[in-house]
A protein has these predicted regions:
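Conserved structural core of kinase catalytic domains
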Residues: 7-62
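Conserved protein-kinase catalytic-loop position immediately C-terminal to the HRD catalytic Asp
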Residues: 84-85
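N-terminal cationic-hydrophobic initiation segments that often serve targeting/anchoring roles
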Residues: 6-7, 70
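C-lobe/activation-segment region of protein kinase-like
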Residues: 50-79, 89-162
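Short N-terminal edge-element motif at the start of the domain
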Residues: 1-5
């Protein structure tokens, strides 16, 4: 949504294709982008956070999309200000990508502790790959944890179906 809404700013990647895949995954194809230095990425994020004139339109689009995500998605996370999310297009311009994410630690704690809530909030067809995603900030899953979560969700699905 952000890439389409903010395309006119040229501060987001050019979206070549986007498809919602079976099982709750998405495939996003965008223009080729190159990494920038950590300092340059952090500076771009600071300019967005400060609503500097050069990025004010982009910041407004980010706010709109982020607010919608928070309304529509349980366990919506804060904006990701990782400097690695700032990249450079072939034409030299800076773009920001991958700003939105789920609050993984809270989400997966709920999967473990209250799988019935997850089953109510996320239909089965949208969470097929839920336990296949890594937790970027905390590494991989402890041995057997993903399997225990899958079993807990399957049992909650059976309870919901009656």
């Amino acid at each position: 949504m952000l890439y389409r809404a903010a395309a006119h700013t040229r501060q987001v990647p050019v979206l070549v294709d986007h498809r919602v895949l079976e099982g709750g995954s998405d495939l996003t194809v965008m223009e080729y982008l190159r990494p920038v230095s950590v300092a340059e990425g952090a500076a771009f994020h600071r300019s967005i956070a400060g609503r500097e004139p050069a990025v004010a339109a982009l910041a407004a689009h980010i706010d709109t999309v982020h607010a919608r995500g928070a309304r529509e998605q349980p366990w919506w996370g804060p904006l990701d200000d990782n400097p690695a999310n700032v990249l450079r297009g072939a034409d030299g311009r800076l773009v920001v990508a991958d700003l939105f994410f789920a609050d993984g630690p809270a989400l997966y704690a709920t999967v473990r502790d209250d799988p019935d809530r997850i089953v109510r909030d996320y239909p089965e067809h949208l969470r097929r790959h839920m336990t296949e995603l890594p937790l970027g900030s905390s590494g991989g899953w402890p041995d057997g944890d993903a399997e225990r979560m899958r079993h807990g969700l399957a049992a909650a699905d059976r309870r919901l179906r009656g």
